[in-house]
């Protein structure tokens, strides 16, 4: 109704922006500056590689998905006040960043397997750098 439209318009007009373009670009640059040492990068890539040859997956993580995973690990490190990404960042983000990027085989899907469970098993199985 017109009354609801007016209410919505008033509510949206009262919402203050939380960031501007310059602020977003600045944070993106800060994320890219977070250091990812070679052992952590290789760890992340081993997890990605395991999705590409997993028997329950028709489609694993793409190169673009791997880059998103890498950037997410950098962003998590920054949010935790660190200038470097750690294996903990990689482990914490594997499922939330990668699960929707996987395509399960029909057999796995109908057998009750989930992308989350596959990623949990991969993360548990890939050796963590020390």
Describe the predicted segments one by one.
Residues 1-46:
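Conserved AAA+ ATPase core "coupling" helix
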Residues 42-45, 51-130:
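C-terminal engagement/docking regions of AAA+ P-loop ATPases
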């Amino acid at each position: 109704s017109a009354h609801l439209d007016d209410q919505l318009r008033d509510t949206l007009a009262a919402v203050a922006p939380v960031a501007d373009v310059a602020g977003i670009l600045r944070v993106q640059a800060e994320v890219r500056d977070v250091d990812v040492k070679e052992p952590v990068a290789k760890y992340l890539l081993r997890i990605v590689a395991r999705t590409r040859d997993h028997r329950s997956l028709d489609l694993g993580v793409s190169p673009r998905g791997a880059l998103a995973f890498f950037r997410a690990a950098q962003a998590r490190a920054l949010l935790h006040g660190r200038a470097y990404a750690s294996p903990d960042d990689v482990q914490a983000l594997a499922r939330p960043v990668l699960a929707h990027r996987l395509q399960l085989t029909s057999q796995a899907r109908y057998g009750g397997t989930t992308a989350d469970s596959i990623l949990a098993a991969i993360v548990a199985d890939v050796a963590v750098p020390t």
